[in-house]
């Protein structure tokens, strides 16, 4: 049995078992079971109010589950690891100072948090494909470009 568990988590990035999340008496998630494999792409779809955002917040550790367990790479959320401290999350519409360039937005953040050098910021922007646009104001970025800037921010904070 132990051998099976080890091999299961080698190929599993997220394992959700019997997860229920209640707000008061109302269950938003009820007995959710889900296994997400490494190297696969998944989407969460459903009607408004069906619990998609709540599920994502539980996986990230931003909301505790009422019952059940969520493991990310074998580590249980809320017990084995403090994921909000160690996880980079990119929201659907990242908020940046639109009058400044992508470089300037990341430099401001780096200065506030005493993080990385300006040269490293430029390397990260190149890695996410924003080097040709690094001097363009973020207000002129497409949504996809803003999301890539959000990815650059998450990389920078890692």
Model regions: which residues?
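Conserved ABC transporter NBD signature motif
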Residues: 68-83
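Helix-to-loop junction immediately C-terminal to a conserved catalytic motif
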Residues: 60
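The feature captures the beta-strand-to-loop junction immediately N-terminal to the Walker
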Residues: 45-47
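Conserved ABC ATPase "signature" region
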Residues: 107, 118-133
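Hydrophobic anchor residue at the start of the ABC signature
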Residues: 151
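Q-loop/switch helix immediately C-terminal to the Walker
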Residues: 93, 99-112
């Amino acid at each position: 049995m132990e051998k099976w568990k080890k091999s299961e988590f080698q190929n599993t990035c997220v394992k959700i078992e019997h997860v229920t999340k209640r707000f008061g008496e109302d269950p938003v998630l009820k007995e959710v079971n889900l296994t997400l494999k490494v190297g696969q792409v998944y989407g969460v779809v459903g009607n408004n109010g069906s619990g998609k955002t709540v599920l994502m917040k539980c996986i990230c550790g931003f909301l505790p589950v009422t019952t059940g367990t969520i493991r990310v790479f074998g580590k249980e959320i809320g017990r084995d690891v403090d994921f909000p401290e160690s996880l980079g999350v990119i929201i659907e519409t990242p908020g940046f100072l639109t009058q400044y360039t992508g470089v300037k937005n990341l430099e401001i953040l780096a200065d506030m948090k005493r993080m990385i050098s300006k040269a490293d910021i430029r390397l990260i922007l190149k890695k996410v494909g924003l080097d040709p646009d690094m001097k363009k104001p973020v207000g002129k970025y497409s949504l996809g470009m803003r999301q890539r800037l959000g990815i650059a921010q998450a990389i920078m904070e890692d």
